[in-house]
Amino acid sequence: MSKPAGSTSRILDIPCKVCGDRSSGKHYGVYACDGCSGFFKRSIRRNRTYVCKSGNQGGCPVDKTHRNQCRACRLKKCLEVNMNKDAVQHERGPRTSTIRKQVALYFRGHKEDNGAAAHFPSTALPAPAFFTAVTQLEPHGLELAAVSATPERQTLVSLAQPTPKYPHEVNGTPMYLYEVATESVCESAARLLFMSIKWAKSVPAFSTLSLQDQLMLLEDAWRELFVLGIAQWAIPVDANTLLAVSGMNTDNTDSQKLNKIISEIQALQEVVARFRQLRLDATEFACLKCIVTFKAVPTHSGSELRSFRNAAAIAALQDEAQLTLNSYIHTRYPTQPCRFGKLLLLLPALRSISPSTIEEVFFKKTIGNVPITRLLSDMYKSSDI
């Protein structure tokens, strides 16, 4: 599949001026990798002031191996190689990179003319006709093309900016380990939510259902899709980091609530670890996403029990997704006869962390009290995605 215009994939074999890693093109006036350009952008936009860890300002090594060890020296190196601070500020105008601002703009109806199309490569092995399109929707990473620089045209799409990453082969499938600092966990969560919606919206079988059924399925499955995304993209789920992100501690949070949050974070860590032990490939993740999405079980909206308009079609789609996964595993992993069963047995664990905890930990700081289900509905209906 050919790469779309404007793809941010690395196409140049030119070293990053800051750390020496392979650059992905010119960023803020110099050739730089995604890691250093993203670090520079966040530092300038948020007006960060760093203190050298060794006390020797500018003396720490800044290379591919050590670039994350001292932010002060890394920023100094960015400035020394003439990265342009003004280019950051004028990119979209000064802003706080939060979902709250983007949601406000989004609800006012602004649309992105250029769009932000993800690069969706095809999978290595063929799949049945029903599922070929689904497996092709698995991206190489949470990587979207740049969006317009016009402030009034920002949408939720602009949250999905490239994050520093390193390729890692898992069963031949490129995965990405994030350089996620506390400040960027919420942005990574936003990208996961965005990509889950974009994925569902792009599944041909999903779009054949009524809009009401599509929204009900998405509202019920978003938590499982989110946790699957954490496992797939190797996003860190360190308890201390997540608590720091949420802002919760013993001084400002009821002990019973805090203990519940900590317990569910531990449950999240356990389920993510179990998925990573099995080293799933992109096709398996795509199949599991369909299995957890196509659930023809009546859902509750407050005290109201809602039923699907076409429950039979939804159940049939889930059956087909399971059959596809089973067939794929038998072909791809003939020496692992129990693999299919192991994957299915993992699915209930995706619901071991409550939606309220995910909202509290990953989204509360950025969207406040806006319900995720409302956000999902409006994002899904948007032509921007």
Curated annotation (Swiss-Prot):
Q: Which residues form the NR LBD domain?
A: 155-383
The record's GO CC annotations read: nucleoplasm; nucleus
Tell me where it resides: Nucleus
Q: Where are the zinc fingers (NR C4-type)?
A: 16-36, 52-78
Q: What is its main location?
A: nucleus
Gene Ontology MF terms in the entry: DNA-binding transcription activator activity, RNA polymerase II-specific; DNA-binding transcription repressor activity, RNA polymerase II-specific; enzyme binding; histone deacetylase binding; RNA polymerase II cis-regulatory region sequence-specific DNA binding; zinc ion binding
Could you tell me the Gene Ontology terms of the biological process aspect for this record?
A: aggressive behavior; amygdala development; angiogenesis; anterior commissure morphogenesis; apoptotic process; astrocyte cell migration; astrocyte differentiation; behavioral fear response
Q: What happens when the gene is disrupted?
A: Mice show exhibit hyperaggressivity, decreased body fat and have ocular defects. Female mice lack maternal instincts. In developing brain, there are reduced areas of the ventricular zone and enlarged ventricles. Neuron progenitor cell divide more slowly. There is complete loss of visual acuity, with mice not being able to distinguish the cliff nor light and dark transition.
Q: Which PROSITE patterns match?
A: NR_LBD, NUCLEAR_REC_DBD_1, NUCLEAR_REC_DBD_2
Tell me which family the UniProt entry assigns to this protein: Belongs to the nuclear hormone receptor family. NR2 subfamily.
Assembly information from the UniProt record: Monomer. Interacts with ATN1; the interaction represses the transcription.
What is the official name of this protein in its record?
Answer: Nuclear receptor subfamily 2 group E member 1
* Natural source organism: Mus musculus (Mouse)
Name of encoding gene = Nr2e1
